[in-house]
């Protein structure tokens, strides 16, 4: 399973802003995180609309987090940047076969598990993992649980 480029780039950008802790220009974020600048600007609009970042226009403008890194989850970023409609808004067949109902139930269960897991990981968790990476690698431990 892979994230869309928009989600991965958005996570890179928001994590960079969390690490810096100050206003960063779009050029700085794009260069440091290897994100095409025009694409970053589009993603930043979505992240701003979702209340994840502040965007200040102008010569001394740029981006910063709109709230503390411990209050922004991976799910928040994912939801801000994905284009899919939530499963609850998708058209379901009224007279669905048992097979279709089973498939829908399985997909819904996977989606719920993924959302629960992603909501448990905050930007602060990711920053701590980056800072602890060397000791984690040496000890063989991981900071994030692997879904069973």
Predicted regions located by residue number:
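Short helix-capping/hinge SLiMs at alpha-helix to coil transitions
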Residues: 17-21, 67-68
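A short alpha-helical element within helix-turn-helix/winged-helix DNA-binding domains
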Residues: 27-34
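Alpha-helical residues within the helix-turn-helix
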Residues: 31, 48-49
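Key DNA-contact positions within bacterial/archaeal DNA-binding proteins
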Residues: 38
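Beta-hairpin "wing" of winged helix-turn-helix
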Residues: 50-65
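Conserved segment of winged-helix/HTH DNA-binding domains
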Residues: 69-93
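C-terminal regulatory/oligomerization modules of transcriptional regulators
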Residues: 94-148
């Amino acid at each position: 399973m892979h994230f869309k480029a928009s989600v991965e780039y958005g996570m890179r950008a928001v994590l960079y802003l969390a690490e810096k802790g100050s206003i960063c220009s779009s050029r700085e974020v794009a260069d440091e995180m290897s994100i095409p600048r025009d694409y970053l600007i589009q993603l930043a609009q979505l992240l701003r609309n979702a209340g994840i970042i502040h965007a200040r226009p102008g010569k001394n403008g740029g981006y910063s987090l709109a709230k503390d890194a411990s209050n922004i989850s991976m799910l928040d970023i994912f939801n801000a940047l994905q284009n899919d409609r939530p499963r609850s808004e998708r058209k379901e067949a009224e007279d669905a076969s048992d097979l279709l109902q089973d498939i829908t139930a399985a997909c819904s269960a996977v989606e719920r598990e993924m959302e629960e897991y992603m909501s448990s990981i905050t930007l602060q968790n990711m920053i701590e993992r980056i800072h602890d990476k060397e000791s984690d690698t040496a000890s063989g431990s991981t900071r994030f649980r692997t879904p069973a």
